């Protein structure tokens, strides 16, 4: 009986330690900037709020800037972070800047309780492209959009 209780206590203690050590997503950001588009956009999602900002960088004034700021709920945040595969995101390889060819650079930043991960233009091969664009779709849906560039 003592042996069983000891094993149970040890298993619970180990489970508690491993859960405490898990990396938790605290914030997700997406930015696009530069190039011929002459505007930049920035999305931020965390457990408190969801924000979007688009602003014109140069040129004739247009209907920009646009700003959206919405409160977030713990339930929504939990569902959002469950959709993100942090391990796959960590494996993405940064791509070269696209501004030299008048393109926009795109950056995704994921902040956790342990570290900040930043990836730029990380869609250079089929595997990376799938992970990258799936994450962009997850972010877009948080704002009721079909795609991040809508």
For each feature predicted by the language model, list its residue ranges:
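Short, well-ordered, aromatic-rich surface patches in folded extracellular/luminal domains
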Residues: 22-35, 81-83, 90-150
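Short, low-complexity, polar/charged sequence segments that are solvent-exposed and flexible
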Residues: 46-52, 64, 73-74, 89, ...
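A short, structured loop/turn motif at beta-sheet edges
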Residues: 47, 70-79, 110-116
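Mature extracytoplasmic domains of secretory-pathway proteins
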Residues: 67-93
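Short, surface-exposed coil-to-beta transition loops
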Residues: 37-42, 65, 102-105
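Acidic/histidine-rich, surface-exposed loop or edge segments in extracytoplasmic proteins
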Residues: 52-68, 119
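N-terminal export/targeting and maturation segments
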Residues: 21-56
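Bacterial Sec-dependent N-terminal signal peptides
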Residues: 1-24
């Amino acid at each position: 009986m003592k042996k069983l209780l000891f094993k149970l206590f040890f298993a619970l203690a180990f489970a508690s330690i491993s859960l405490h050590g898990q990396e938790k997503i605290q914030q997700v950001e997406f930015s696009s900037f530069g190039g011929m588009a002459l505007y930049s956009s920035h999305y931020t999602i965390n457990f408190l709020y969801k924000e979007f900002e688009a602003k014109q960088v140069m040129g004739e004034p247009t209907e920009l800037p646009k700003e959206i700021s919405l409160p977030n709920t713990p339930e929504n945040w939990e569902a959002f972070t469950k959709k993100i595969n942090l391990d796959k995101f960590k494996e993405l390889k940064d791509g070269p800047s696209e501004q030299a060819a008048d393109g926009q650079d795109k950056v995704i930043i994921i902040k956790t309780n342990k570290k900040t991960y930043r990836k730029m233009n990380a869609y250079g091969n089929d595997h990376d492209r799938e992970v990258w664009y799936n994450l962009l779709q997850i972010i877009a849906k948080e704002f009721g959009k079909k795609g991040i560039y809508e």
